[in-house]
Amino acid sequence: DKSGTTAEDTAATVTMSATDIESDALTYSIVATPDNGSLGSVSGATVVYTPSTNYNGFDTFTYKVTDANNGVSNIATVTMTVTAVNDVPTTDNGSVTTAEDTAVNVTLNASDVDGDALTYAVGTATNGTVTVSGNTATYTPNAHFNGTDSFTFTASDGTLTSDSSTITVTVTAVNDIPVANDITVTTVEDTEVTITLSATDVEDSTFTFAAVELPDNGTLGTVGSTVVYTPNQHYNGSDTFTYTATDSNSGVSTEATVSITVTAVNDVPTTDNGSVTT
């Protein structure tokens, strides 16, 4: 019988042996192949044993010897000890989809044939931020970004670190509502004023404006990108109205306020005709 040792995933050349008192030429042949590996062709008294991928533990095979006079030996056993080797973890690419301005979690997939506990590390993204907790990464797109982004990650068993894999993130567009701007204007009593309405939108520059709450102390003309405010006759003081902006994708802003100051004007006194009899 023989014994040998090799490391996991490493082939070993085994030299079989036998004795013959007549010193005949001997021919070696395999009787039973190993359960957890494979054998190459027998060459003289040697054979190459290759353990199965990632296997470690004990394995055996048997052989016999035939001499020049066709005498056959007993069956001998070769016991192989395959020592464990720490295997590098492996990781898988992945993909995830989220809406604009919305964070998304993605599970990082990795495996280790040794069953070791794994820790994960993530790289940076061009158009967002990435954090990791356990095997879960959280991707947060930059404000108003939409399109394709990606980041890489690795897994470590505490000794060996995997190659990088890539998570591809698709960020779908969401219509951002416009922001109507508050406005302050001044006019004088009994004098109309033209007011330019305005709004901002990260995606759009064309808006439709609509008045919501009308002024208490004046009137508005037709609302477009501008509107004419006419104070009531002889009114002076403060007045307000509100409006909204709608973008080309039908997104409607919250209400904005136009604050109007109507300054007083000294009015000419008026007199009345009269008559008298004496």
What are these regions (language model features)?
Residues 1-33, 52, 87-125, 142, ...:
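Extracellular ectodomain surface segments
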Residues 53-57, 143-147, 233-237:
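Surface-exposed, short loops/turns at beta-strand junctions within beta-sandwich domains
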